[in-house]
Curated annotation (Swiss-Prot):
GO BP field: glycolytic process
Function recorded in the entry: Catalyzes the reversible conversion of 2-phosphoglycerate (2-PG) into phosphoenolpyruvate (PEP). It is essential for the degradation of carbohydrates via glycolysis.
GO cellular component: cell surface; extracellular region; phosphopyruvate hydratase complex
Necessary cofactors: Mg(2+)
Compartment(s) of residence: Cytoplasm; Secreted; Cell surface
Primary subcellular site in the record, as a coarse category: cytoplasm
Binding site for Mg(2+): D245, E286, D313
Signal peptide feature range: none
Pfam families: Enolase_C, Enolase_N
Name of the protein in question: Enolase
Superkingdom: Bacteria
Length: 430
């Protein structure tokens, strides 16, 4: 029998650690009265939306201004005294206490990185205190849906030093019978793609998210991915489709989109994306238009919303207020979920809940600056989101999430269901 006093928060410590880009980030440990401990590390993005919660950095010379010692101090000197004595089981109360302590709209006082590290560590401590895996603790008995992975195998934009304007070209192995088989299919295409790039004399160096970063145009990238899928023995659009993260805010200036040597209005940009959808087996487009181009997004949704998944990342920033605006205006049909965009686990779960109740899909996502923390793998199963974006099939901070999903699938045994096998997640276009 577990004593409820054993699940009370006793101690919180924090430290500065490194992310996958060699930049400092925040790690927190929450220790409970009964001895259980939870640890979490927060990620960091390169292409960040203007409406994201505030990530606190030190400035100055240390770590070229990117240190997080101030965030660590906030955890140990301000957050810890406020939370010690609270039950780790009451995630909403823990998160609410931190939001009240911060007092700002965007977590600029304590920093979203401080709040999120403690928020995630608290959930893990509670799960460990109860002897439950994190996905089961957060999701209950129905947490058995393994997500379709959106695998970023060609990197461009802000994630790579190459000529490719669009940020991510992804494989979507929705036609697999299980997550394990989906991972195998994606991995085989990844290695086939490497051979194709080598044969064409192109670079096989990788970007921040583990995908290749060759000098290609957007159409060429689509063509070589389709070729890789076929050469690996799979049917494009039937077994494996494509997804794009355009990250168009990155090349939007003065009301126009400048890429591939051209300059386009919002309507012309929609036309460009429509051409790509007609040319390739694309099932999902993320950030097809800029974060505040609401009129353009509305047009994009009218033109393509019935054909493909239209994911708002910079548009929604995991924020229920912006998501509600999109719902009210019939804008997009999916939300990208990044825990550090909003900065607490409770608010993340609220965004996923609002999306589901409104007929929007949710895609659980990593950031380009990642760590060995695997919380998002458990979160994807806990929330039955049905989709996860956690990079390519290389770099251990990406593979860590895939390996955790393999463990979860094994642990669930016959109860495990792969989202692609039951028609959830992006649909194929044979």
């Amino acid at each position: 029998m577990i004593d409820s006093l054993d699940l009370v928060i006793d101690t919180i410590v924090a430290r500065e650690v490194l992310d996958s880009r060699g930049n400092p980030t925040v790690e927190a440990e929450v220790l409970l009265e009964g001895g259980a401990m939870g640890r979490a590390i927060v990620p960091s993005g390169a292409s960040t939306g203007a409406h994201e919660a505030h990530e606190l950095r030190d400035g100055g010379k240390r770590y070229m201004g990117k240190g997080v010692s101030q965030a660590v101090t906030h955890i140990e000197e301000r957050i810890a005294p406020a939370l010690c004595g609270l039950s780790a089981l009451d995630q909403a109360a823990v998160d609410a206490a931190m939001l009240e302590l911060d007092g700002s709209d965007n977590k600029s006082n304590l920093g979203a990185n401080s709040i999120l590290a403690v928020s995630m560590a608290t959930a893990r401590a509670a799960a460990n205190g109860l002897g439950l895996p994190l996905y089961r603790y957060l999701g209950g008995p129905l947490a058995n849906l393994l997500p379709v992975p959106l695998m970023n195998v060609i990197n461009g934009g802000a994630h790579a030093a190459n000529s490719l304007d669009f940020q991510e070209f992804m494989l979507v192995p929705h036609g697999a019978p299980s997550f394990r088989e989906a991972l195998r299919m994606g991995t085989e295409v990844f290695h086939t793609l490497k051979d194709l790039l080598n044969a064409k004399g192109m670079s096989t160096s990788v970007g921040d998210e583990g995908g290749f970063a060759p000098n290609l145009g957007n159409v060429e990238a689509g063509e070589i991915l389709v070729e890789a899928i076929q050469k690996a023995g799979y049917k494009p659009g039937e077994q494996i489709s494509l997804a794009l993260d355009v990250a168009s805010t990155e090349f939007f200036e003065n009301g126009r989109y400048a890429f591939d040597g051209g300059s386009y209005t919002s309507a012309e940009m929609v036309g460009q994306l429509e051409q790509l959808v007609n040319q390739f087996p694309i099932v999902s487009i993320e950030d097809g238009l800029a974060e505040d181009d609401w009129e353009g997004w509305k047009l994009l949704t009218e033109r393509l919303g019935s054909k493909v998944q239209l994911v708002g990342d910079d548009l929604f920033v995991t924020n229920t207020k912006r998501l509600q605006q999109g719902i009210d205006n019939n804008t997009a049909n999916s939300i990208l979920i990044k825990v550090n965009q909003i900065g607490s686990l409770t608010e993340t779960l609220q965004a996923i809940d609002l999306a589901g109740r409104s007929g929007y899909t949710s895609v659980i996502s990593h950031r380009s600056g990642e760590t060995e923390d695997t919380t998002i793998a458990d979160l994807s199963v806990a929330t039955r989101a049905g989709q996860i974006k956690t990079g390519s099939l290389s770099r251990s901070e990406r593979v860590a999430k895939y390996n955790q999903l393999l463990r979860i699938e094994d642990e669930l045994g016959s109860q495990a269901v792969y989202a692609g096998a039951v028609g959830q997640g992006p649909r194929g276009k044979a």
